[in-house]
Each structure stands twice: as structure tokens, then as C-alpha cells.
Amino acid sequence: MGQNDLVKTLRMNYLFDFYQSLLTNKQKNYLEFFYLQDYSLSEIADTFEVSRQAVYDNIRRTGDLVEDYESKLRLYQRFEKRRELYNLMKQSLNQPELLKQYITQLEELE
């Protein structure tokens, strides 16, 4: 698995966590098996008794769908920004003015 594949898988795992409640059971199952359980297309196709192409199409469409949700709702983007600010805050505990700036930025995200 290449670096880009790993980054995409990690991103899809986060997007799945944030948006799975908006998906159908079939969409959830396919994404979970593919990205979280690391099943191959063939294994998923065998499990659900469908073609590999059907699995591939569903995963691609569902991936596009969660990316669309993210572009509109930005839950993952805000999560990443909060995580970054928390780390910066930990590093600036001895710098009150800088810490205040980070707290302000964090409050603006809410």
C-alpha cells in the first residue's frame, strides 16, 4: 500500500466515523469491510453475493458521497483544526498570550 493509499484510507476511516449515520446499511457495510476490515473487492462480493464491479461502484459512489458531506459540513476539517490547536496549546502552557490566541481560535470553531 502506497503513501497516498494510506492517507486516503485514513481519511475515509475518519469520514466514515463522522458520516456513517447518514449512509444506508449497504453503504456502511461495504465501506466498513473495505476500509476498516481491509477486505478485498472479491471478498466483499462473495460475502454479499454480488459482482466485484457492483462492490467497486458502490464504494466509489459512497466515497464520493461522504466527501460531499464533508465539503458541506466540514466535520473532519474542524476536528483536525481542533486537534492541531490542542497540540499547540499544550506546547504553549508557559506562554499565556499565545495560549489565549489558541483558545480564541478554538472558540471560533464551535
UniProtKB/Swiss-Prot annotation:
It comes from the Bacteria. Transmembrane segments: none annotated. It holds the Pfam family UPF0122. Might take part in the signal recognition particle (SRP) pathway. This is inferred from the conservation of its genetic proximity to ftsY/ffh. May be a regulatory protein. Belongs to the UPF0122 family. PANTHER family: UPF0122 PROTEIN CBO2450/CLC_2298 (PTHR40083), UPF0122 PROTEIN YLXM (PTHR40083:SF1). HAMAP family: UPF0122. This is UPF0122 protein SE_0911. It comes from Staphylococcus epidermidis (strain ATCC 12228 / FDA PCI 1200).
